[in-house]
């Protein structure tokens, strides 16, 4: 298509990438295609408006730059063809904005939607993100030699990003080498939040958020497949353990051909779980299957990874436990002796507010989600075109407002709980309750350094449990038939989407 037709797309240039139209801000030129898949296309692009000057504020002024600036532009396609794709896109937009500024989470620079000039409709979104040189999967697959300090640095950075994510009560749920972006200086950033979900200490509030779980099988926590009675932030720690094992061994540790084979490979390494763990499996078919298998002893990590640092194996042992209750937390992992060379409290910051999933996860209509996406794009485009100082001020105000709302919500919950426990006191004057005089620092403003700021874009900016039957009932059980195997595979593949007790 002739570039002269670009004005019908509101000043954007039209490119052909993988035989699809790739319509981007005319100030950018496509450098090369980075990849494509079921959900879209990614290209690298260079900022170039002819003068090789990058605008640094919303007044259109420009500043000289020795090197042109590069970005990764991701086109998410067919977002309104299915509810699940639309919700995934909305989740990605909101979370990338929410976590924007943390050094170990990919930075979102801009958003764009391209309406059809005739109908005004759109079915795709463009995300402008910081460009990284490769991902962890490519590094491991290349076979290039890495030192133990490389492993330490990579895992430490993953945990720093995950600590920030978990502190906002968010589960990533799709951590894998392909979702860890890396630069030549070994800087690492977590990407792809399309499968993320909220987390609550109240299990009843988590039950509805485990649908549409299709994370990569090799890095999926066993409690998801086995339908444990609850799921926690430990599911992400399992994935980090799988990544550490892959770094140490140069290949994935659990490479199941299907979900039943995946479970078999996990049990071959971790051994037969104790009865107390089996009883927490929500899927009775999975319980019966595990009990039908021969008793297996736990494998030795020293034999699996003979050249590995013993401290790395100790951390791996604590990450890869079948029972999620025994798995190390992200905070304890950061303090593990294996990572002490990199340990820096200033790098291990926590998010000061909780992410609000309820505002959109309960929305299922395509029209409603479409409007939410349009609103998100418009608000973010306006935000990133403000001067950096104003962005920081707005972000600080939003954080403080959200923290105050969450403080009030927690007070209301505590008051309701007190009234439930002491119904005779329900009629007491609210002014006499102890909560009015409760001292708290939840709403106290923190110093500015506690908040990750919008990144100073030096290179470019867009500014212008039920108990199971006893074990002896199953010890003589035969292996499942072909039909039972298929049913088990279906159940393990759906995990908590299928069975939640």
UniProtKB/Swiss-Prot annotation:
Active-site residue list: 174 (proton acceptor)
EC number: 2.7.11.24
Transmembrane segments annotated in the record for this chain: none
Residue numbers of Phosphotyrosine PTMs: 213
GO process annotations (BP): cell integrity MAPK cascade; negative regulation of glucose mediated signaling pathway; negative regulation of mitotic cytokinesis; positive regulation of calcium ion import across plasma membrane; positive regulation of calcium-mediated signaling; regulation of fungal-type cell wall biogenesis
Domain Protein kinase positions: 28-339
Residues bound to ATP: 34-42, 74
InterPro entries assigned: Kinase-like_dom_sf, MAP_kinase, MAP_kinase_CS, MAPK_p38-like, Prot_kinase_dom, Ser/Thr_kinase_AS
Cross-referenced SUPFAM superfamilies: Protein kinase-like (PK-like)
Catalyzed reactions per annotation: L-seryl-[protein] + ATP = O-phospho-L-seryl-[protein] + ADP + H(+); L-threonyl-[protein] + ATP = O-phospho-L-threonyl-[protein] + ADP + H(+)
Modified residues (Phosphothreonine): 211
Key words, A-Z: ATP-binding, Cell cycle, Kinase, Nucleotide-binding, Phosphoprotein, Serine/threonine-protein kinase, Transferase
Posttranslational mods: Dually phosphorylated on Thr-211 and Tyr-213, which activates the enzyme.
Residue segments, region Disordered: 400-450
GO CC aspect terms: cytoplasm; nucleus
Protein's UniProt keywords contain Cell cycle: yes
Activation/inhibition comment: Activated by tyrosine and threonine phosphorylation.
EC supergroup of this enzyme: transferase
Protein family per UniProt: Belongs to the protein kinase superfamily. CMGC Ser/Thr protein kinase family. MAP kinase subfamily.
Recorded domain comment: The TXY motif contains the threonine and tyrosine residues whose phosphorylation activates the MAP kinases.
Protein name: Mitogen-activated protein kinase MKC1
Source lineage: Eukaryota, Fungi, Dikarya, Ascomycota, Saccharomycotina
